[in-house]
Each structure stands twice: as C-alpha cells, then as structure tokens.
C-alpha cells in the first residue's frame, strides 16, 4: 500500500472513531470541517434530522474575495469567521467541533480559532 493510501486509511479510521462519540443536535449542532488541497469547507449539521443548518467555504464569493490563494490558514480563518457569523444569525452559539479525522493543526486550527473569536463556543 502506498504512503498516500495509508494516510487516507488512517484518516478514515480517525473519522469513524470520532464520529462514534459526537453527534449534533438542534441546540448544539456539529461543526463539520473538510479540507482539500485548494479549499476548505465548514458545515453546521443537525444529526437528528440530517439537515445542514449553515455552510461556508472558500468557494463562496464573500469568503474568496481578497484572497490570493484559498488553500492556506488565512483562507481557513475567513471560513471560520463566516460560519460563526451565519451561526449567530440563526441564534446558534454552542457547537460540537468535528475535525473529520484531520489533525488539529494548521488550517483546521485556524478555522476553529477564528470561529471561537467570532462568537462560537466549543
């Protein structure tokens, strides 16, 4: 198995291990984060109904404007601020953070810190 495949399998194992322990509710939805090489995505998910309450990503025009590159920590921080703003508009202040198997470092940490600075608690 190649080293890339091993990393992907390890991430999926971490993802399932974390997902068994946390769930989102209407009062405290799950803040799910996904990152690719060029973009980062965040969603607020109510697991009882399976509904996405709010989402933000570097593909959105309001987040992407002013960024020269969308795959770095600066872009992740803008996504964190945007998802926090959308959550506060829906009167959501507390969430459960789901790093989706990614290590809490770099872009994931930047998104989480920006969301906390803009009013979300987790």
Swiss-Prot record:
Part of the 50S ribosomal subunit; part of the 5S rRNA/L5/L18/L25 subcomplex. Contacts the 5S and 23S rRNAs. InterPro entries: Ribosomal_uL18_bac-type (IPR004389), Ribosomal_uL18_bac/euk (IPR005484). The keyword rRNA-binding applies. Keywords: Ribonucleoprotein, Ribosomal protein, RNA-binding, rRNA-binding. It comes from Citrifermentans bemidjiense (strain ATCC BAA-1014 / DSM 16622 / JCM 12645 / Bem) (Geobacter bemidjiensis). CDD domains: Ribosomal_L18_L5e. GO terms for molecular function: 5S rRNA binding; structural constituent of ribosome. It holds the Pfam family Ribosomal_L18p. One of its GO terms (biological process) is translation. This is Large ribosomal subunit protein uL18. This is one of the proteins that bind and probably mediate the attachment of the 5S RNA into the large ribosomal subunit, where it forms part of the central protuberance. Belongs to the universal ribosomal protein uL18 family. GO terms for cellular component: cytosolic large ribosomal subunit.
